[in-house]
Regions:
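Intrinsically disordered, low-complexity repeat/linker tracts enriched for polar/charged residues
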Residues: 6-17, 21-28, 32, 115, ...
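Short acidic low-complexity segments
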Residues: 88-103, 138-152
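Asparagine/serine/threonine-enriched low-complexity, disordered tracts
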Residues: 105, 112-114, 122, 132-134, ...
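Internal alpha-helical scaffold of NAD(P)-dependent oxidoreductase catalytic cores
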Residues: 174, 203-216, 233-281, 285-320
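NAD(P)-dependent Rossmann-like dehydrogenase/reductase catalytic/cofactor-binding core
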Residues: 276, 283-287, 312-322, 326, ...
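NAD(P)+-binding Rossmann beta1-loop-alpha1 motif at the extreme N-terminus of oxidoreductases
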Residues: 2, 31-85, 93-94
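Rossmann-like NAD(P)(H) cofactor-binding subdomain of soluble oxidoreductases
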Residues: 97-98, 148-233, 249
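Short, low-complexity intrinsically disordered segments enriched in A/P/G/S/L with frequent Arg
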Residues: 18-19, 29-30, 108, 118-119, ...
Length: 418
């Protein structure tokens, strides 16, 4: 890391720079320009890449989908983000080795047809940064150490949840590289892996080993991509078991329009950001069936109770779910018109099939996968999650939303704490 020991992250004061025009939403630069690799150039990844580039950092954004990268290069825009312009200084590539090694130049040549054909992804898969090892998938790329000639200072993970394990495996630190020399990874992807039932930071740790835990952070909170793209006020939290890392991530991302708080309950932050997507699908069903504000308020409240029950059973702190990554993200995703998961639930309530609703949205609906993982975790740990159970039944067992509502409302009487 520029000007610092590889083991340390610089402390800073978040001083607003008062003499900048209102359109320039940045802080007094407390960090020297950092070399940042963003893995995943879907809507969230490219907005975060542009955010960091506009703060003065050197940013490379990678995606497995050649057509996505070439479109971004040619238009500096994204079809799902009207009016958004990619920061001019963001370097875009489909070459993973280029993305993680700043000693290599990023090719500016147009991506050839043979490369685009090798990456046989439809638009929905491209947004997901699908990484299943099919033809055209990148080779492994060892990330140079922090402080080396080409080493990035930070890696931001913005791929869909089902691609995170592959990224961790492809970018595994060299066997002889101490954890303290490994660039920190900031996980901005939300989800729970279906096979391992691990959240995303846990997935990376399971690939690299426990000694790397302090090199992993999570950025999460109520943050619609389209509003971050428009530089509307947004507040999130940076969580890590390493307080110096959470402070570093705070400083890296924070502006006077993108406020970041630090946290140390990584598990709670990740579970909050993942489980709320399942509850948001239920809220969308509620609104699609026109059940009223009373029903939505009850669903959000009881959904939060389910999140807390599962989180505490897994070792998270209950108070984390009252914060930005829990209640904050839950309210936004259940009530906001920009929520994919809420929209997905609304479409189901109005008669669309699961596949029709997914196709109409055209982007990843993380709650679809998380419903399966959350239910499996609840069964494994003996946690009662009736809303999650009914969402799972609608999505994966063909149950109608009307029948799910009837079963939820027909449950036996019990104390609220249950």
């Amino acid at each position: 890391m520029t000007g610092t020991s590889p083991a340390e992250f610089p402390r800073s004061e978040h001083r607003l720079q008062p003499d900048l025009p209102r359109s320039e939403h940045r802080l007094q630069p407390d960090l020297p320009p950092q070399k940042v690799t963003v893995l995943g150039a879907g809507v969230w990844g490219i907005v975060l890449a542009s955010h960091l580039a506009r703060k003065g950092h050197v940013v490379r954004a990678w995606d497995v989908a050649a057509q996505v990268v070439e479109r971004l290069r040619q238009t500096l825009s994204h079809p799902k983000l009207p009016g958004f312009r990619v920061a001019d200084t963001v370097q875009l590539t489909t070459n993973l080795a280029e993305a993680v090694d700043f000693s290599k130049n990023c090719s500016s040549e147009p991506i050839g047809e043979h490369q685009a054909e090798a990456c046989t992804l439809n638009e929905n898969q491209a947004e997901a940064c699908t990484l299943n090892g099919e033809e055209g998938a990148p080779r492994a790329a060892l990330i140079p150490a922090v402080g080396s000639k080409g080493g990035p200072d930070c890696v931001v993970v913005a791929a869909a949840s089902h691609g995170v394990r592959a990224l961790a495996e492809w970018c595994r630190p060299p066997a002889d590289q101490p954890p303290r020399q490994t660039p920190p990874w900031v996980v901005c992807s939300k989800g729970i892996e279906e096979d391992s039932l691990l959240p995303m930071a846990g997935v990376i740790e399971s690939v690299w080993g426990a000694p790397y835990r302090d090199r992993i952070a999570v950025l999460s909170g109520p943050s619609f991509t389209a509003e971050v793209a428009r530089q509307l006020p947004t507040t999130v939290c940076a969580a890590s078991t390493n307080p110096r890392l959470s402070e570093y991530v705070q400083t890296l991302f924070m502006t006077n329009r993108f406020r970041v708080y630090t946290q140390d309950d990584v598990l709670g932050v990740e579970l909050g950001g993942s489980l709320k997507n399942v509850i948001a699908i239920a809220a969308g069903v509620c609104d699609g069936m026109e059940l009223g504000d009373n029903a939505r308020a009850a669903l959000i409240t009881r959904g939060l109770a389910e999140m807390i029950r599962l989180g505490t059973a897994l070792g998270a702190r209950p108070e984390t779910f009252a914060g930005l990554a829990g209640m904050g993200d839950l309210i936004l995703t259940c009530c906001g018109s920009l929520s994919r998961n809420h929209t997905f639930g609304t479409l189901l309530a109005r008669g669309r099939t699961v596949q029709e609703a997914l196709a109409e949205i055209g982007m990843v609906v993380e709650g679809m996968r998380t419903a399966r993982s959350a239910r499996a975790l609840a069964l494994k740990h003996g946690v009662t999650m009736p809303i999650v159970e009914e969402v799972y039944a609608v999505l994966h067992e063909g149950k109608s939303p009307q029948a799910a509502l009837q079963d939820l409302m027909g449950r036996g009487a019990r104390p609220e704490r249950d």
